[in-house]
Amino acid sequence: MIVGTAGHIDHGKTALLQALTGQAGDRRREERERGMTIDLGYLYAELEADAQLTGFIDVPGHERFTHNMLAGAQGIDLVLLVVAADDGVMPQTHEHLAIVQLLGIPRALVAISKCDRVDSARVQIVREQVRTLLAPGAYADAPLIALSSVTGEGIETLRQELLQAQREVQQRSTEGGFRLAIDRAFSVAGAGIVVTGTALSGQVAVGDTLLLGPQGKPVRVRGLHAQNQAAGHALAGQRVALNLSAERLALEHIHRGHWLLAADLYAPTQRLDIDMQLLPGEPRAFEHFQPVHVHLGTQDVTGRVALLEGASLAPGERMLAQLLLNTPVHAVKGDPLILRDQSAQRTLGGGRVLDPFAPTRQRRSPERLAQLHALVNSATLEDVLPALLANSDTGLDPQRLARQFNRPRSSWVLPADVRLIDTRQGPLLFSASRWEALKSPLVEQLARFHELEPDQMGPDRDRLRRFTGSTLERPTFISLLDELLASGDIASSGPWLHLPGHQVRLSEEDEALWLELQPLFEQAGFDPPWVRNLGHDEATVRALLRKMARLGLMHQVVRDLFYPDNMIRRLTAMLLQLADANPVIQVAAFRDAVGLGRKRSIQILEYFDRIGLTRRLGDRRQIRLDSALAQHTEH
């Protein structure tokens, strides 16, 4: 169990831990000279013989060091709120309590300290103050223990309360990747660099490779301590010290706020969707795009908050919001965060991360807001997935979901209605019903294209995607088309897509001109006439021949030079025969085989290069065996 202190300056937090554990805090010279805690202190103790070690994090109480307090409050299991009997509830008591409640720390104990300085009536007054303070929140029933670090009064009662809490604390799940928010980094003679922090998820073992810091530098775990004891592995919920090694690893490159992560989780982000709450004691509403300090893990970064459901947020209210940060952070769903004002002098509120990879567009669309509300109300991936899919026309990236929830895909239990669609850029998740619903409109739009362009065989894939106005990314759209082609709902002729029964209808003028020109091309063999030599308006002939090329009946080798499809196939067969004799084909060999001049032969070969039949190697050619033309041509 990890216990963190909280409370106003000079209320006796450090002295209380010393009385409880027998270990001195405030080990830094400056802290001893000034008589107050400035940075985080760490203690470990057995609260009774043979008990598990309990870790204690002693935080500073002065408002100037609240940023240090926030770094220590992340990941603790129980907060020990200390209120001095002589002072009573003070400003930092309020702020620290607000912070630990916003962080969602599950348990609290309250120590009314310095009881040796006051009478019992004063202790009772402070008890009532504390009860009033705690009443609206999650710690309303927290035990209150009056004690004195000087006389020892109440220390044993506190010890027993902590032991009972330790027995009841739930072990954090070790599922998911390892995450450590670094709060200290130092060098040990003979060992090297050591970093410490609370393991927030997963587990780590000696020999593991992790990614460190903003650059994601690979480091190896040479050794580790868990709860201040040498160990071979450590688990989520434990205080961990890791001895790291890596090439050119320098202490000055590691700072509080850096993360140590399993490789699969490394995904820095500067845009996060959150469920935000403004503290009820705030004097004014929070405005859209207001600048803030954001404390997440042990990081302290600046940015702005874009409110997603209104122009302002009233004190005590909640709202969906998007963080736009100036520095990359690491986060997963459910991570708590604290928001402080631009000057870092006052805590404004906090929230929970919903999506660490928030979109840049459509962030306020009804579909996106529905997804975010589902994330607020659902704890697990399986719970929220149906709502996420129901409000997504473009599918969900399973790799991104695995990072968002810190859940390896092997642990997912997908609903029956979920389909995994393979695309050229990786798999996507769709609800089966929504995926099927995307098909009918596409077929209907293709039919509409045929009505508008009856003299065309059909559009290619990209033109059809533009024509339909599809919001699907190109790889996903192609996967949808592939299914329609496989099912026979759509057919293809070369690159052109069409309905199975579609027949091109030329206009009467085009039909008459084609009947006149077609014999000329067939009779010309490998040396067809140029457009200018066909005896008709060049623009009209050119438009018709390009139309016939889209139908697959002609091939435009160069501008104004077209070959019939059967001639291209004969030329392909001759090229394949040459390749049988020698896989590397010389221009001269092809020229001699077809009986044309060198210039025309090169024009034909360059056309074959463009359509993927051949690969150019200087002035030679090699057949691409995966070419559809090569595979479907007999020779």
Positions of the model-derived regions?
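Conserved Switch II/interswitch segment of TRAFAC-class P-loop GTPases
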Residues: 59-64, 73-97, 101-125, 534
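Conserved nucleotide-binding/hydrolysis micro-motifs of P-loop NTPases
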Residues: 62-63, 86-90, 105, 114-119, ...
